[in-house]
Amino acid sequence: MSTTCRRAAGTTGRVALALLLALGAGSAQAQDAGAQGPPEPEAPAAAGAESSDDALNKALDSTATQWSFQGAWQIMPDYYNDTMSNGETRPDGATDYLQLRIVAPLAFEKLTILPRVTLRHYENAQGQAGMGNTEVFGLIIPKSWDWGSGRTGIGPLVTLPGNKNVARDEWGYGFAAAAVNSSGKWFYGLLFTQTWRAVDPTSLPPTSSDTNPLGIAPFLNFQLGGGFYVGNGDMVARYDWDTKQVYLPIGIRLGKVFVKKKGSWNAYFEYQTSLIYKDWLGSAVKNSYRFNITYTMPIG
């Protein structure tokens, strides 16, 4: 295990506790609200202003027409090392990565385009580090596909070459689609991703096929009051077209949204492990921890 992995595993508990204490700092106001839900914004609400439930759900919505700046650190200190069906020992994946994601919305009369760039810097168990396959994605949402409380969209996805020690040094291409909806304190949806080329060598062993596994990410968030929420996190299930096998993680996310006049901050901690992986011929994380901060800002 790399020095970074050992250090991350040793400090994860303290960092998680510090984050949860920080999130709890703003909960005193929520106590006064009682059964009335989250406290009202500091500034007087204008007529027709969105409710606190809607404002929180919007901060969680990656398909909303708003600027988004995300920074995240994910630590994967240990993996399952059982014997796979092909007789080989299950390999480890990356030990940790830093992620930066930016969304820059383009609003037109008949549609909205959400260009999104995701950069990740990985480190593996051998101590090797470098940039992963940067993703450039453009979600296209026609106005007719937006029904107010939710929307659906689809768009092209391109992956750039990464450092060969931690990623594939080649281009990839594909598409992604999303469908989301909010109802009161609930926010839920489904994301799909399908790419070709640039197959992650730690996810599945390289084969003659250029087809990556299909990514399916259902998500569900519920508001707890006072800006707090709980959800299942980035639970990306994968289906391998070649072996017909499925990998399914499971996790829990606890976060808090701070709604401000010009935008919102979303801070969360997430834990994840592997639920279905026995027939999967790739890595399967045993314990994964993510610390995230995101700032969203409506256009205009």
Give the positions of each predicted feature.
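Bacterial N-terminal signal peptides
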Residues: 13-24
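Sec/Tat signal peptide C-region and signal peptidase I cleavage site
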Residues: 26-30
